Amino acid sequence: MAVRKLKPTSPGRRFQTVSSFEEITRSTPERSLTEGLTKKSGRNCYGRVTSRRRGGGHKRLYRIIDFRRDKVGVPAKVAHVEYDPNRSARIALLHYSDGEKRYILAPLGVKQGDVVVAGDSVDIKPGNAMALSRVPVGTIVHNIELYPGKGGQFCRAAGTYAQLVAKEGNYALLRMPSGEVRKVLVTCCATIGQVGNLDHEKISYGKAGRSRWLGRRPKVRGVAMNPIDHPLGGGEGRSSGGRHPVTPWGIPTKGFKTRDKKKASSKLIIKRRGQK
């Protein structure tokens, strides 16, 4: 999981760093666990842009990941740790004792040959999955369900984890990576440990082209646009926009609260991120 710095043979490589990929044990995916991935370019079903600055990028195969960990009581051996172009984390190929194969997010410290299992009476070790009711207070977890049986939705990116800080009745209190403390039902499943590939945050792309390989297009400033395209656009020569910074839809963009005060999940948030 080390980061390798390239020799400055060109301006684009001068500050470029890449992963060493030393934990990768196989370069090709399990074909039965892949499917085609059609590019959306940030468009929704009506063809309208809903996520700006998306498009292009290298062709990818989607790896089908088991976020639910619903194969209870069946031990699985980690056959390979692989690269996944669709996420920042590495993925681990599991060979279950009954012959089935599945991908999971590769936790920190889990390597080829290790055995992991999901269930309510399993050891507290990285890679094992269980309900939050079975996890001791103080343990760090990842791939956390928000609704029982739906599959993990929290803490899936490289290096992320949440800490179980308390249990109150039917709820477990988790400290999220943002610092937010929120309630989650104790019947929700989580995987022990931290997501691997910690050095992902230290990667420097070095040049614009590397962002384009990932399907990320340039970000144009509002003040550089025409008045029809942005509230800050227009003016003679270079202008400051003439008003406080706003989004293309006129919503203040620096410090303005956008969360719905009537949102149902607000009662499950004990401490907002950034609060003392």
From Swiss-Prot:
Annotated protein name in UniProt: Large ribosomal subunit protein uL2
Originating organism: Oleidesulfovibrio alaskensis (strain ATCC BAA-1058 / DSM 17464 / G20) (Desulfovibrio alaskensis)
GO cellular component: large ribosomal subunit
InterPro entries the UniProt entry points to: NA-bd_OB-fold, Rib_uL2_dom2, Ribosomal_uL2, Ribosomal_uL2_bac/org-type, Ribosomal_uL2_C, Ribosomal_uL2_CS, Ribosomal_uL2_dom3, Ribosomal_uL2_RNA-bd_dom
Record has Ribonucleoprotein as a keyword: yes
Gene3D superfamilies according to UniProt: 2.30.30.30, Nucleic acid-binding proteins, Ribosomal protein L2, domain 3
Region called Disordered, residue ranges: 26-45, 224-276
GO MF annotations in UniProt: rRNA binding; structural constituent of ribosome; transferase activity
Transmembrane regions listed in the UniProt entry: none
Key word Magnesium present: no
Oligomer and partners: Part of the 50S ribosomal subunit. Forms a bridge to the 30S subunit in the 70S ribosome.
Function: One of the primary rRNA binding proteins. Required for association of the 30S and 50S subunits to form the 70S ribosome, for tRNA binding and peptide bond formation. It has been suggested to have peptidyltransferase activity; this is somewhat controversial. Makes several contacts with the 16S rRNA in the 70S ribosome.
